[in-house]
Amino acid sequence: BZIBYKMGHFRWGAPMDK
């Protein structure tokens, strides 16, 4: 989810800074 990006979660095993 988009909220995961904002929380800085690494959903795909990589840091997502979106």
From Swiss-Prot:
It comes from the Eukaryota. This is Melanotropin beta. It holds the Pfam family ACTH_domain. Belongs to the POMC family. One of its GO terms (cellular component) is extracellular region. Coiled coil: none annotated. One of its GO terms (molecular function) is hormone activity. The keyword Cytoplasm does not apply. It is found in: Secreted. Disulfide bonds: none annotated. Keywords: Hormone, Secreted. MSH (melanocyte-stimulating hormone) increases the pigmentation of skin by increasing melanin production in melanocytes. It comes from Scyliorhinus canicula.
